[in-house]
């Protein structure tokens, strides 16, 4: 077994990718102002006919020095660079003038990834759910392909033990040289509630601890497009 077996596209949805834009709250940030910003952003995306497949706001469960929230986008891979070139050239300055006092989008620090789905996709209330990222660094004398045996066992365990488990499991592979490119694997999961997250997260940590050094971050997600 080799590492190429990790990066197998199991999606039937075409060639898509995900990225996370760090955002900082401005002096005029409030819940109502954020809702207004979201509404204006969606209107702008529609007016310009940009094909954004999905957008989500992620609030970190623990305070981050790097961002106050993440703005997650899913796009067709072929459209991604075109979108950002047009946005930066034609819209970013005016957007920042209008909305920079509410939130600053750190578009020079985007984390972009190709998503490799694992296991079964399950229904999810996208208005309020949980995402977890496990950042995995290989221990000495271990190979990345070892994760596949555990991942298969994990999916079987979820099924046979009637554990609620994740609604989505994926391996994320960086598409550019950002700072999260230093990890050997990012294990990404979505969960319906905290009980499901806590139960599955412990199983994953126990199963991967012999292969990787791991640290995790958790966020509350809300779909906005």
Task: Go through each PLM region and give its residues.
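Short S/T/G/P-rich N-terminal loop/turn motif that feeds into the first structured element of a domain
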Residues: 1-225
């Amino acid at each position: 077994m080799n590492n190429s077996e990790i990066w197998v596209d199991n999606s039937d949805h075409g060639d898509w990718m995900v990225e996370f834009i760090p955002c900082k709250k401005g002096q005029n940030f409030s819940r109502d102002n954020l809702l207004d910003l979201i509404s204006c952003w969606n209107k702008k995306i529609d007016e310009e006919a940009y094909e954004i497949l999905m957008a989500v706001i992620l609030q970190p469960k623990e305070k981050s020095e790097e961002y106050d929230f993440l703005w997650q986008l899913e796009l067709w891979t072929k459209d991604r660079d075109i979108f950002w070139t047009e946005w930066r050239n034609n819209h970013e300055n005016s957007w920042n003038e209008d909305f920079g006092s509410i939130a600053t989008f750190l578009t020079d620090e985007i984390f972009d990834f190709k998503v490799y789905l694992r296991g079964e996709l399950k229904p999810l209330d996208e208005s309020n759910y949980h995402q977890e990222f496990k950042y995995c660094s290989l221990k000495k004398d271990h190979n990345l392909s070892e994760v596949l045996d555990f991942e298969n066992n994990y999916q079987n365990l979820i099924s046979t033990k009637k554990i609620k488990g994740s609604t989505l499991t994926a391996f994320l592979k960086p598409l550019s040289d950002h700072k999260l490119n230093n990890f050997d694997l990012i294990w990404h999961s979505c969960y319906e509630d905290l009980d499901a997250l806590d139960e599955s997260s412990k199983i994953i940590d126990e199963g991967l601890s012999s292969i990787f050094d791991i640290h995790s971050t958790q966020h509350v997600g809300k779909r906005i497009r």
